[in-house]
Amino acid sequence: LLAIFAMMLHRTHQVHIASVGRVGDSEQFRNIERHTATTFDGLLLLRIDESLYFGNAQSVHANLMRLSDDTNIHDIVLIMTAVNHIDLSAQEMLCAFNQSCIKRGQHLHLAEVKGPMMDILKTSPVIENLSGCIFLSANQAVQSLTKPSTDL
């Protein structure tokens, strides 16, 4: 039983975070290392492929910081389709990442957050202090964030 728990902890500690892009003209977004996909200037789309909790929050934070460390990136979208659970430690990690984004002049957005997850997050500091927006889909995020500015 202890071995099974150790294996599970090890597997969930190393969360896969994929940089994704649009496949063709579709509304599908896939890992740019595995598929021919279009990326967008100034926009980083990252799909988190595991639930977030105390056991992986530190490694997720380190990976997010590494992947977003580019002065050309203005908007970061975390695609949360595979995130079924988030504990308090992971919420604190997302708040810290959001603050890092703000300091670097970046906006952090969330997309495809499941209903039960949103129920947890909607009263948390994650949403209260989010520097960006919450989108229903990655496609909606891309459409909104890649529109030419109409400010004069």
Name each model feature, range by range.
Residues 1-123, 128, 152:
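The feature marks cytosolic C-terminal regulatory regions of anion transporters and related permeases
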Residues 71, 114, 138, 145-146:
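Low-complexity, intrinsically disordered or weakly predicted helical/coil tracts enriched
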Residues 129-144:
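Short acidic-hydrophobic, aromatic-tinged amphipathic segments that line or gate anion-handling sites
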Residues 143-152:
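Intrinsically disordered or compositionally simple regulatory linkers and C-terminal tails
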